[in-house]
A protein has these predicted regions:
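Catalytic nucleophile loop
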Residues: 50
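Catalytic-core regions of hydrolytic enzymes
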Residues: 124
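ATP/NTP-dependent adenylation/nucleotidyl-transfer catalytic domains that generate, transfer
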Residues: 2-40, 56-59, 63-66, 73-80, ...
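Short, charge-patterned binding micro-sites
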Residues: 53
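Conserved G/P- and acidic residue-centered "switch" motifs that form tight phosphate/ATP-binding loops
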Residues: 47
Length: 272
């Protein structure tokens, strides 16, 4: 048996970040070329995921990368918006600052109140705006999900999960932190607590109840062991409770519908 931190060190001990960066940049160029798009657009919150995507997009596309900063001023910390605008200034990105507060309130006035549903509505409003500009400018939408959040379904379906390309989805959150440092993302962004900002005081690890270090260790084993079971994990790893392993595995299993296209009806016409 080994402590989970030993496995985590294997996950984050990547020596070829330069190759990873080159491969992502090549992927972005190829996708935009293949789809005959004129550039890319993405939401920029000021968090590590979207800032990492901003650094990659700025290098590959320059002014053909449009960053949309879309706070809801009633819930989004002003420091987040400030960080996003500072990154834009440093990278010289084309951008638009759109406060979605008014749009969200118009919806809310006609809907019964529910914090989670209205929080996810914020993500879906942002997705609508991003795709509006994608349509307007013939741009592809860059998603900002990392592998950890993608695999546990920690994103809003048809909200921040909506994208044409997912450039950082093969990097677990703990790997992304190291990669972000490598490409020059500022330390205050790298060390910042992850937050979807769907409501006031909304932080990812607090909502999930488990650290990304533990999440990534379990997800790595789910992805790489031939026949993962909770009991097998607990037989081989210490430092993570059975309750947490079960929760991560259930999130992985129960959110698969978020990672696939809608189910299609089979033959509805019968035999001919």
């Amino acid at each position: 048996m080994v402590d989970y931190t030993e496995k985590l060190s294997e996950i984050t001990n990547i020596s070829n970040y330069a190759d990873i960066q080159q491969n992502i940049e090549k992927f972005l160029k190829n996708m935009v070329s293949q789809k005959k798009a004129d550039g890319v657009v993405f939401g920029l919150s000021g968090g590590i995921d979207s800032v990492t995507v901003a650094y990659l997009a700025a290098k590959v596309f320059g002014k053909k990368a449009l960053a949309l900063v879309m706070p809801d001023s009633t819930v989004s910390p002003s420091s987040e918006t400030g960080d996003a605008l500072k990154v834009i200034g440093e990278l010289g990105l084309d951008y638009k600052l759109i406060d979605i507060d008014v749009i969200h309130k118009i919806y809310s006035n006609h809907l019964e109140p529910d914090e989670r549903a209205l929080g996810n509505l914020r993500a879906r409003i942002r997705a609508n705006i991003i795709y509006y500009y994608a349509n307007l400018k013939n741009y592809l939408v860059l998603g900002t999900s990392d592998k950890s959040e993608y695999l546990i379904g920690y994103f809003t379906k048809f909200g921040d999960g909506s994208a044409d390309i997912l450039p950082i989805v093969e990097l677990y959150k703990t790997q992304l932190r190291e990669f972000a440092k490598f490409i020059g993302v500022p330390d205050n962004i790298v060390t910042k607590r992850s937050s979807p900002n769907l409501w006031k005081g909304h932080y990812a690890e607090e909502e999930i109840g488990i650290s990304y270090e533990k999440i990534d260790t379990v997800l790595y084993c789910i992805e790489n062991w031939s026949d993962f079971t909770v009991d097998e994990f607990l037989d081989n790893m210490t430092g993570i409770s059975k309750k947490d392993v079960e929760k991560i595995y259930q999130m992985y299993q129960n959110t698969q519908h978020k990672r696939i296209l809608p189910e299609r009806a089979g033959s509805i016409y019968g035999d001919f």
